């Protein structure tokens, strides 16, 4: 079931709810506060181990369900990330395929009522999945994740109408299991963090400016007002014996 929780600035619970509409698994992967002060939640709906739907639900700021939409392209469909776009819509990223690893990247654009505008199943090398999304200044959408069946770095860009701009599977010597987050850089280009805890700064053409291993931090990036980068996440000890939670701050080199 979905578990939703809202707190005040001190961490005191304002409201919480458990929500489900099926006898199978339903869970949330991401949520955002919308421009109108309410919330949209996305993830997976009615997962029985073989079939599932991508889900988008909107709640009021008091936790009341406003609407619910599901999307599917094949047996298994899941959303990992949602953004609200400059043109007043939503874009979702995840995968579509089977529950056993034959994945294509999935990108969906909807209007503010969750009604589908376009949906793209994007083929790359091996199984492919989008974990993170960002809207560019030109209004296109970049997805970051994995390709080559969990072994390589994946970037894809679609324009506002869903047309392809690029679709890149970067197969390197070391398995890194894909990107987990992408954010714009105030210095131009984008910062990305991958499963192997490598922070990469690329320019607008996808060319690498710098790449640095940041220890056991691999899930999320923020840029501070002074340009420093903070990366949070976890890693694994030798032999995959269990990870530690880390927070790393660093100053990128001057471009």
What are these regions (language model features)?
Residues 1-255:
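A sequence-level/structural motif corresponding to short, flexible coil/turn segments enriched
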